[in-house]
């Protein structure tokens, strides 16, 4: 049914249009072999200049097209449901509404967070068997077990990341999931927005995807074995060291979750994958734009000074402390 057609959702406000552009151009560069790539952009207050630049960029690829979706009704819809804004904005929720609103001809749709670089072919996601599940996700590499208890999960339950979401669109529509999800949200509130929703509401209906399709940059920033141990990740609910290393040099999608020494798109960053973002930035209409400057704060200095055995434990302590406040 998919036959080389990839439908993709991106979402951002105007501040992150350039970051989205980096991700989009990396997607297009590494998937020129696909028959068609349809990009649906959910833009919150995108400026005309950004729209023109994105249109021009995507237009350089014969197998790609971009559609800017009218999301003007989304904020009011989300307020009516009663969901909690994320960092003052509702945009993180937009994709959850768009899944039912978009008219696509394939059985699946892929959401990609702008904080990513696509570094390989995504044929595997077009061919993936959902096995009756609603969506396919990868485990989250930054969520500690203590927080699972807050939202009613067990340490042995997987907590999935929503930075890359492969949606079984056929099932979403057939089972009228949009209406069921909205009703659930009217009676439940979540701290980590739609990601908590997916882990709770869709528990048992998520197919685990390999780490290569959502490879967190924490694996490049920290000693992997020490990181797994410090965070108490269990074999039943997280990837093994060997699984992570299998994709270490050949991930399909790299997700920027490590920013201690600057985000990879920021000027002056010392991020282990910053070179990749710079590579693809040069292929966008923003190649000469002045990017935000990375700030060398106390966390960056500690990261440079302290051994990994201490750093990973400090990280785990900080995250546990942060989410303990949500109890």
Q: What is the predicted role of each segment?
A:
Residues 57-100:
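Active-site-proximal specificity loops/subdomain of glycosyltransferases
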Residues 17-32:
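Histidine-anchored nucleotide/phosphate-binding helix
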Residues 72-75, 91-143, 159, 166-167:
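GT-A fold catalytic core of metal-dependent nucleotide-sugar glycosyltransferases
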Residues 1-12, 19, 178-327:
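A glycosyltransferase accessory/donor-loop signature
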Residues 164-176:
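Conserved nucleotide-sugar donor-binding
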Residues 31-40, 66:
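Short loop->beta transition adjacent to catalytic acidic/histidine clusters or analogous donor-positioning motifs
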Residues 135-154, 269-270:
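A short, conserved beta-to-alpha structural element at the edge of catalytic cores
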Residues 37-45, 136-138:
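Short internal beta-strands
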